[in-house]
Amino acid sequence: MRIGIDARELTGRPTGVGRYLASILAAWGDMPDAKAHTYLLYHPQEDQLDLPSPDSGALAIARRPVGGGRRSWWEQVRLPIALRRDRPEVLFAPAYSAPLMAGMPVVLTIHDLSFVAHPEWFGWRERTRRRWLTALSARAAGCVLTVSQFSKSEIVRLLAVPPDLVRVIPQAAVPSRIPGGGPPAAPGGITTRRREPFVLYVGSIFNRRRLRDLIRAFAIVARTRPELTLEIVGDDRSHPHEDLPAIAAAAGVGDRVNIRAYVPDETLYDLYSRAAVFAFLSQYEGFGLTPLEALAHGVPPIVLDTDVAREVYGDAASYVPMGDLDRTADALSRLLFDEAARRAILDKAPAVLGRYSWQKTARATLAAIEETARHPAGGPRG
């Protein structure tokens, strides 16, 4: 079978959805069933496609650069022309929307619905485009994949998609053999290395992730701990814009908060392996992958107490209430300096991490694609 894939997220600097798709392709490279198919990877002609690892070379992959722009015009006009030319049996769209005139069954992944649940976090053009295209794409798809039960409930509630059309396939903690895939793990999956006195955040910078609260809570702890620093890695996509350097300066820690928009995987995994604590104060996520990645590297995470966080991290996280700087500072201090508190979380990590693997994710995703191709009227159920 020939499987078309919208591979735009593998161009440029892959983050988020790009790492999701890269990890699935890498895992498919180890699966005999996956090697029976041919994969047509579509991307804008102007952008270089970056395949994730040598493992994906075990797959029959055909690159399909498509000219004629980017974003919605490319997706809705140029991509359908290429699909009609190549005629794959099914299209996998891993990033929220798909061509409405694809001319074939579509498997669509919707990771979260923040732009519907909280439109105030997006500019009017971006939220309108996302909401319209995602809703129409979901209703036209043969199968909708998502990453948590929480996100499934949001898709059903906010987009009016029938629940039996939506399948939950979680992500996993560490990308499958992406170059620089991290230091060796100790038994149980937790990496061992001497920790350094810094707090780490990794992820795109959105308002919902409340970096302003993290900086201010960090400042409370840092007043009496001059050795502490806060490392923030993520592209600033806040709306309305939040000036994090100014917030840090106002809190008195401007010289102790280091912000980088992007780091290569080798640097990222080095940061994970050295950090003492990971903090991710997001009030809305579909899954929330980076705290799991931190946990896999032996870093206890602090997260907001939300339904999806409880679903994903279970007992292997420290939970704090939204907006409570004192409680957040207490959690930071406890996990930075109390070894028993750190161990209480890390001892729970193997059971939580054992729920997830990119092999499981890739296998379930391929099954959904194959079944949707065979039964295009509705795809898989469950």
Task: For every predicted segment, state its role.
Residues M1-G382:
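Carbohydrate transferase catalytic cores enriched for Leloir-type hexosyltransferases
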